[in-house]
């Protein structure tokens, strides 16, 4: 570091790398050849290795034991390269940097209290690139001997235990609920399997057997992530800023100004003067993900039970990969308080850059190009799985084969301009002269000045728009098939493949970033070579950037695929239950028939047998078997439970319909919005079978009634009981509950079981949002500023006016007056009774905004909705102002006053020296206080607010890791937590919250809601596993959320942050806040 009152250094070459040159007054650095102010590089690398080997006796996860060896190995390698910039700065004086040849400023800052001037033959100002790479691998292998239960009941019990364990380990509410339903239905299957064996005359030995198998299973996964993030240079002048590229007497090969991914700011004027070219460019932040996984295994063994001895073999294989890459731009910005002037001897290019000044003047010798840049984010993942097994009887029983295959794919593409390239002038206007051609590609020349102050004089003018697009697709294809004798270790339905044939989901959004020039004079001198009609150029610069945000949520779509798979498996279980019930009914019927065989039955059976076996004579045993089989088949078909029967087809249709809704708010969707879709799927699935169609609608009717009834499921299996569903199904089928036949009772039981499973698994994670049938939305608060009634009336009047083509300003003024009058009353309430404003008016105002956010499809349920987007915007603006007023003026002290008025809390208040003082002022001060533990610079963290996870979230996560023990980093995309210290049991979740969005500034309550959501997820964490790493609640001793917020977070927002901190304490979660400036 070089520090002095003033500094004047002259040399042939000057280099400042990762250092500081600071003076109170003037600084002048003069190099006869090259002057470089750049960064010092730092590199870090680390490797974490976890390896575990086990041998001997272990659990299988179900009811069984495993004898063999197990091995797990994970490696995590990281490498980080970062750059520490230099600083050249004068507190109160001028800064001049001069070079005879090249002047380079790289990832560094130059600050002048007064004027700042850079001069060189060529001047380059660029951004440093910080990079981080991580390679994570996980391997597991297991081989040995497995002893487990087999037989119809034994296999069912084993499946139920395994599935229940999976439900306990699942963190996502709805997935846990579906797993719980699977476990419960496995119990039903176990009971049924025993009933069927008993009906067939068997005992305990036929129900349960033992299987012994020798096998192996191994899996591996790899993931590599690479990130580069730029850290731009910054030039700041208290007065004027100038950059000049002289060309050094060789203008043919030099004389360029290049500024990339950097920020220039001057309180006065800014001037760029280049003998040749001026380039203002964006700098790219990049991320890349590559991953793959594979698994395979198999086993061979024998199963012994009352039904005989069987030899079986199983095999499975799976593989997948993912690819992701993204580019996100850091724009060059020039911000001048006075005039911005530019001269280039040849070309001037702005690509990913914004120039802002009160007045803009530019003289371009040849071509002027302005071009916006699109952020890009692409992702593609594929996964395939296949498994199969065969069981061959050695003695007794029957052969069986099962096959299962599935394939998933996720694909997403995102391309959109975020920050539009442009020249933005204030009241001084723009004056641009271009020697030859001006090209605007999705860029603007904008001015707030009167049209007579804006001129563009060019040889020719070209312009084009940029199309922004976001699209994603999610596909699932799969099925399973099992045939043959008794139920084996796989209890999925024989028709599972027909249940889960496939699913598709997707999304699409688009926008247009237009080229535009503000109103003013455009002169095209070379009309002969002008290609486009200038009249086609947009003059609306304020609405030119039709940017769109990302619409693909990878985790949500992956969970959607899991839900579809689980719904299909639940449906398969329900179909198996129905089929087994049909077998039980048929077996009882056949047994009864054998007790009362008539002579004509014997004659008919003999003819049937001999027709099926030409040339052979039937024995008495053959005839008896034929009588039994005929009675069995007739009863099974009449029961409706067989393949193609109305019960089976109705259940299949209901399952297919509900699968199509997977992933969203199932409770809300089922209660009416998707009724046409559901009806269409049912009709397609059941065809012309009215009984099947009616049964499918009965199942969905029961699920819908359950969802709309707001029953609190909370993910618990079995809460949605078949008894609860049965009355609705009986009613839908048009049957009398007092006169049901045995067959009808069995049908109701099977349909109720399916309805309970679907409702229980699907609504458990979202019952708080479920709509109560046709009355949905009618219970909203009816008193809002504008209250809901006023908002709806305003909406109708404005919509009718617009349709008539009249002048609608009078309508808007009328309702604004109503809003203003009610806002005046709010001011009085805030002054005289602020607590009332907090507990009543605030809820009322929020209700007004809530009605603007109701989706249009709710109108089909009888709910009132607003249709005019214009009216919605006005209500949101007016009510948002009142909400902001309430949050700023009342929430802090009112909440604290309520707290302090409790005698049990007054000791704490007195310890703060507040008792006996003005409680209102003290509370306001206390609740609105800044409770951050530290303040750090954004450049040291490497983050930028409001620019997405890549530029905001990930840098903060990396920064937090620098303060934690080496080796505590969890794998990328680990659930809930980012760091876990195995030595102490401490877990940390790193979060960043941009409080400066319009939504959070106008409604500070959103700050509390966002933090509370993170606290709840942290507090309720039970277990997560990824890439061979497992963390469960028993391993955790302390939980912490490390939160980053902008340094200019408002006092009202700090009130909400402090509320969240107190809430976290009650939940056992520590919230630590750091300000980032």
UniProtKB/Swiss-Prot annotation:
- Composition-biased stretches, type Polar residues, lie in 531-546
The UniProt annotation puts the region (FHA-2) at 67-384
Where is the protein localized?
A: Target cell, Target cell cytoplasm
Domain of life (superkingdom): Bacteria
Q: Where is this motif: VENN CT cleavage motif?
A: 781-784
EC number(s) per entry: 3.1.-.-
Major localization listed first in the record, in broad terms:
cytoplasm
Q: Which GO terms describe its molecular function?
A: deoxyribonuclease I activity; toxin activity
Spell out the residue ranges making up region: Disordered.
531-555
What InterPro entries does UniProt report for this protein, alphabetically? Answer: CdiA_EC869-like, CdiA_helical, Hemagglutinin_rpt, VENN_dom
Q: Which Pfam family would be a valid example here?
A: CdiA_helical
Name the keywords, alphabetized: Hydrolase, Nuclease, Target cell cytoplasm, Toxin, Virulence
Q: Region DNase activity: which residues?
A: 954-1077
Q: Which cofactor does it need?
A: Zn(2+)
Note, other: Encoded in a defective cdi locus that has been inactivated by gene rearragements and deletions.
Report the protein's function.
Answer: Toxic component of a toxin-immunity protein module, which functions as a cellular contact-dependent growth inhibition (CDI) system. CDI modules allow bacteria to communicate with and inhibit the growth of closely related neighboring bacteria in a contact-dependent fashion. The C-terminal 123 residues (954-1077) has DNase activity in the presence of Zn(2+), converting supercoiled DNA into open-circular form. Toxic activity is neutralized by coexpression of the cognate immunity protein CdiI-YPIII, but not by non-cognate immunity proteins from other toxin-immunity modules. The CdiA protein is thought to be exported from the cell through the central lumen of CdiB, the other half of its two-partner system (TPS). The TPS domain probably remains associated with CdiB while the FHA-1 domain forms an extended filament with the receptor-binding domain (RBD) at its extremity; in the secretion arrested state the C-terminus of the RBD and YP domains form a hairpin-like structure as the FHA-2, PT and CT domains are periplasmic. The YP domain is probably responsible for this arrest at the point where it re-enters the host cell periplasm.
Quaternary structure, from the entry: Interacts with cognate immunity protein CdiI-YPIII, which blocks its toxic DNase activity.
Q: What is this protein called?
A: Deoxyribonuclease CdiA
- The gene from which this protein is expressed is cdiA
């Amino acid at each position: 570091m070089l520090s002095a009152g003033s500094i004047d250094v002259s040399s042939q070459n000057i280099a400042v790398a990762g250092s500081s040159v600071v003076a109170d007054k003037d600084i002048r650095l003069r190099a006869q050849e090259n002057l470089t102010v750049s960064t010092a590089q730092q590199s870090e690398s680390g490797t974490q290795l976890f390896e575990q080997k086990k041998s001997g006796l272990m659990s299988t996860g179900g009811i069984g034991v495993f004898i063999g060896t197990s091995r797990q190995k994970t490696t995590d390698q990281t490498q980080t390269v970062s750059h520490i910039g230099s600083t050249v700065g004068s507190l109160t004086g001028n800064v001049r940097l001069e070079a005879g040849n090249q002047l380079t400023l790289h990832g560094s800052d130059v600050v002048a209290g007064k004027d700042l001037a850079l001069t060189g033959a060529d001047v380059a100002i660029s951004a440093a690139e910080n990079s981080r790479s991580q390679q994570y691998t996980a391997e597991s292998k297991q081989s040995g001997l497995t002893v487990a239960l087999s037989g119809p009941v034994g296999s069912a019990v084993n499946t139920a235990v395994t599935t229940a364990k999976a439900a306990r380990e699942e963190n996502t509410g709805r997935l846990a609920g579906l797993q719980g339903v699977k476990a419960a239905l496995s119990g039903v299957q176990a009971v049924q399997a025993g009933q069927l064996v008993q009906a067939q005359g068997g005992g305990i030995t036929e129900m349960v057997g033992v299987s012994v198998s020798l096998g192996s299973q191994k899996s591996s996964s790899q993931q590599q992530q690479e990130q580069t993030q730029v850290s731009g240079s910054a030039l700041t002048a208290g007065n004027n800023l100038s950059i000049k590229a002289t060309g050094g007497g060789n203008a043919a090969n030099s004389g360029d100004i290049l500024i990339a991914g950097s920020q220039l700011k001057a309180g006065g004027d800014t001037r760029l003067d280049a003998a040749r070219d001026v380039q203002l460019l964006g700098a790219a932040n990049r991320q890349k993900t590559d991953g793959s996984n594979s698994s395979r295994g198999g086993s061979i063994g024998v199963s012994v039970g009352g039904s005989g001895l069987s030899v079986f073999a199983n095999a499975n294989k799976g593989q997948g990969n993912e690819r992701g890459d993204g580019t996100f731009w850091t724009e060059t910005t020039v911000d001048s308080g006075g005039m911005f002037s530019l001269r280039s001897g040849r070309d001037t290019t702005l690509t990913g850059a914004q120039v802002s000044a009160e007045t803009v003047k530019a003289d371009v010798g040849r071509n002027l190009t302005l071009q916006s840049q699109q952020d890009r984010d692409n992702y593609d993942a594929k996964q395939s799985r296949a498994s199969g097994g065969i069981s061959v009887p050695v003695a007794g029983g029957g052969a069986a084969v099962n096959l299962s295959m599935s394939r998933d794919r996720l694909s997403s593409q995102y391309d959109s301009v975020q920050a539009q390239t442009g020249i933005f002038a204030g009241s001084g206007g723009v004056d641009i002269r271009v020697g030859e051609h001006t090209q605007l590609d999705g860029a603007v020349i904008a001015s707030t000045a009167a049209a007579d102050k804006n001129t563009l004089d060019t040889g020719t003018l070209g312009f084009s728009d940029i199309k922004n697009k976001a699209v994603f697709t999610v596909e699932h294809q799969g099925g399973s098939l099992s045939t043959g004798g008794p139920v084996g270790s796989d209890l999925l339905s024989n028709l599972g493949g027909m249940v889960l044939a496939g699913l598709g989901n997707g999304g699409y959004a688009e926008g247009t970033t237009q080229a535009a020039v503000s109103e003013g004079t455009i002169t095209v001198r070379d009309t002969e070579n002008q290609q486009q009609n200038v009249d086609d150029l947009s003059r609306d610069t304020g609405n030119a950037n039709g940017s769109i945000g990302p619409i693909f949520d990878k985790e949500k779509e992956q969970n959607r695929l899991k839900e579809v798979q689980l719904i299909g498996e639940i449906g398969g279980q329900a179909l198996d239950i129905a089929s087994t019930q049909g077998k039980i009914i048929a077996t009882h019927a056949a047994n009864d028939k054998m007790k009362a065989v008539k002579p004509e039955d014997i004659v008919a059976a003999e003819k049937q047998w001999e027709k099926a076996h030409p040339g052979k004579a039937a024995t008495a045993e053959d005839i008896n078997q034929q009588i039994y089989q005929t009675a069995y088949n007739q009863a099974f078909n009449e029961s409706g439970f067989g393949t193609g029967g109305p019960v089976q087809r109705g259940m299949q249709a209901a399952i297919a319909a509900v699968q199509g809704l997977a992933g969203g708010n199932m409770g809300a969707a089922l209660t009416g919005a998707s009724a046409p879709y559901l009806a269409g799927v049912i009709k397609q699935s059941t065809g012309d079978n009215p009984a099947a169609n009616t049964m499918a609608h009965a199942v969905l009717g029961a699920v819908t009634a359950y969802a709309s009834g707001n029953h609190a499921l909370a993910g618990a299996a079995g809460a949605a009981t078949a008894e609860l569903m049965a009355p609705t199904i009986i009613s839908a089928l048009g049957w009398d509950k007092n006169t049901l036949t045995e067959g009808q009772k069995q049908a109701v039981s099977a349909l109720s079981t399916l309805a309970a499973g679907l409702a229980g698994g699907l609504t458990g994670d979202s019952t708080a949002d479920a709509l109560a049938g046709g009355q949905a939305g009618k219970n909203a608060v009816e008193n809002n500023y504008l209250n809901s009634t006023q908002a709806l009336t305003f909406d109708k009047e404005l919509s009718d006016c617009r349709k008539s083509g009249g002048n609608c300003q009078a309508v808007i003024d009328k309702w604004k007056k109503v809003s203003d009058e009610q806002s005046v009353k709010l001011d009085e309430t805030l002054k005289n009774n602020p607590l009332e404003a907090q507990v009543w008016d605030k809820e009322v105002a929020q209700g007004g905004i809530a009605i603007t956010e109701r989706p249009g499809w709710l109108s089909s349920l009888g709910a009132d909705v607003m249709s005019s987007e214009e009216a919605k915007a006005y209500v949101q603006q007016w009510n948002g102002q009142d909400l902001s007023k309430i949050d700023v003026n009342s929430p802090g002290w009112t909440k604290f006053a309520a707290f302090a008025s409790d005698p049990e809390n007054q000791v704490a208040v007195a310890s703060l020296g507040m008792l006996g003082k003005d409680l209102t002022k003290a509370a306001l001060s206390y609740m609105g206080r800044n409770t951050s533990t530290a303040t750090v610079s954004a450049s040291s963290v490497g983050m930028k607010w409001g620019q997405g996870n890549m530029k905001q979230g990930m840098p903060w996560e990396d920064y937090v890791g620098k303060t934690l023990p080496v080796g505590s980093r969890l794998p990328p995309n680990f659930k809930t937590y980012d760091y876990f210290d195995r030595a102490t049991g401490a877990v940390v979740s790193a979060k960043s919250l941009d409080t400066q969005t319009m939504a959070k500034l106008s409604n500070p309550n959103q700050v509390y809601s966002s933090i509370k959501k993170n606290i709840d997820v942290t507090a309720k964490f039970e277990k997560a596993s990824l890439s061979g790493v497992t963390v469960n609640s028993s391993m955790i001793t302390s939980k912490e959320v490390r939160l980053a917020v902008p340094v200019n977070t408002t006092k009202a927002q700090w009130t909400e942050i402090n509320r969240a901190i107190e809430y976290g304490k009650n939940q056992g979660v520590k919230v630590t806040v750091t300000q980032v400036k």
